[in-house]
Amino acid sequence: MTKSELIERLAGQQSHVPTKVVEDAVKEMLEHMAGTLAEGERIEIRGFGSFSLHYRAPRVGRNPKTGAKVELEGKYVPHFKPGKELRDRANIYG
């Protein structure tokens, strides 16, 4: 599901709320979450999961075109850990 599809689905479920308001709310929520992670804070949504940053240590990589070794710096990457309720709901096919 894309962000646009999410907005359409939410707007369809909340017919009394204009689509533009739903779009603004979704965009604001995602922007706030990204900003919170950028500040190094963890986000926990009970029953859904938690978002945090994981550190990737510096390493030697390779340029895929030339095969030359490239030094890659350490960096923080976003990480999502699903909550138990989400894992259980997603496991209906397993």
UniProtKB/Swiss-Prot annotation:
Gene3D superfamilies: IHF-like DNA-binding proteins. Keywords: DNA recombination, DNA-binding, Transcription, Transcription regulation, Translation regulation. GO terms for cellular component: chromosome; cytosol. GO terms for molecular function: DNA binding; structural constituent of chromatin. Coiled coil: none annotated. SMART domains: BHL (SM00411). InterPro entries: Hist_DNA-bd, Histone-like_DNA-bd_CS, IHF-like_DNA-bd_dom_sf, IHF_beta. PROSITE patterns: HISTONE_LIKE (PS00045). GO terms for biological process: DNA recombination; regulation of DNA-templated transcription; regulation of translation. This protein is one of the two subunits of integration host factor, a specific DNA-binding protein that functions in genetic recombination as well as in transcriptional and translational control. Belongs to the bacterial histone-like protein family. Heterodimer of an alpha and a beta chain. This is Integration host factor subunit beta.
